[in-house]
């Protein structure tokens, strides 16, 4: 183990999705001999099956590598893997805070994309040394000089020394390691000072409680030491320390500059929040890390078990997921249409998909999920402000003074050919254009303010389809703005179905209501009586569709004879249908709730 910090290098890899970040990490591990051939597997650091399958990194991981440089000196390299997706932007910023350098991976066939830029700016905010790497040079469509020029033009980094590499073929890996050793500064920090460490990830281990991934900046961590978390003042005793190389192995101490895991009998992941500062209980540090914030969910949806008996199992599954994911929230809710379930909060759409997929895959649950909604701010006539994440909880129109909805600032990177289609899409989503600048001859950066409610629905999919997959999106929350919003209720035979109600912009309400009714007419099965499907704003019905009734041919047995005989039978049938309608209730199939999600814009 290096005696001084001079031989330690802490770095992370930043890249847009699919630019080859996890593959590069695999090659670095193999090149330094950290992972033996026996354990090697693709995307080594992505532990979750889902991460491998979707090719995305969800949780941060770290690994320590020993590397003998070309000058014969042994170095200790700590790779801190960061999630690349915009939903996890805060986790990325905390992971970057734990490093001194970053490898910027750019795909030689794609060039610079939106999330690459977003992460680079964060890295520059943390004063990291950035090493550009142009990946996938083995592909026939690779354009290395073009990408080099783009890195200089768009990001403003000197790309003359950018390493051309192919993580897949293992080209250029040695050069990357040399650049890390040469360019990334060693960590500063005094091992004797009061302890100061940042938590950049934490997860739950069923045997040891919460495991915290920390980077020590000042002081030393040792077993039996009393530590304190700055944000909530809770105190714990360190039980064990370890490092990943790449499998966890225990160490006796972690000193300034090092990265490792701490187990300290913490029972809840909520206590060890990402971005919090760890310090000594007896002599706390004077300056904890700035920028700590509690991550708030932005998107909500109801999750209900299809079988009522799975309710407890769903609760257990959600509890377990929450142990590992402090940003995920849930609370019980009841719906007259769907029974008992939970209202869950997520960071964004990808986060929502991942949680739902994990519930279905890891816990074998079959679920109904309602349309995603966002948090609205309602000021009532008394002047009170309430936040509402469920359309069903919206107060009656008469009591609302104003309604505000969250807005995002979206940065879209695209090819110049697709600008028209993208501007049209943003316009349709009630977007306001803020900026449009050309980056070279082929790429363009478009900045729009768009309401979050318009983005959560299917904006990302639409963006990909109008740009043939080339556009990339990055967004941050801008704040709340007042809007003319109404609650659209769906009534079936005059009864409102709470799980189908949505909050929409008044201009869109008629259009949306009509489409919903048409969609529901297709999925609600015929009954023995007529079923009326109506869309309403308050007491005003704005659209209606009817599902026709089944009819038995009651006059089949009459041959000839008087018309009054037939009329009597038909009248009797009508009476019966009327009575049925009064007592009958319509069973709404699962497809109906999904239909709400799939209404084409």
From Swiss-Prot:
Top-level EC class as recorded in UniProt: hydrolase
Catalyses which reaction(s): GTP + H2O = GDP + phosphate + H(+)
UniProt topology in membrane: Peripheral membrane protein
Main location: membrane
Keyword Protein biosynthesis: yes
Domain annotation tr-type G: ranges: 6-188
Gene Ontology cellular component list: plasma membrane
Primary role: Required for accurate and efficient protein synthesis under certain stress conditions. May act as a fidelity factor of the translation reaction, by catalyzing a one-codon backward translocation of tRNAs on improperly translocated ribosomes. Back-translocation proceeds from a post-translocation (POST) complex to a pre-translocation (PRE) complex, thus giving elongation factor G a second chance to translocate the tRNAs correctly. Binds to ribosomes in a GTP-dependent manner.
Membership in a protein family: Belongs to the TRAFAC class translation factor GTPase superfamily. Classic translation factor GTPase family. LepA subfamily.
Name of the featured protein: Elongation factor 4
Gene name for this UniProt entry: lepA
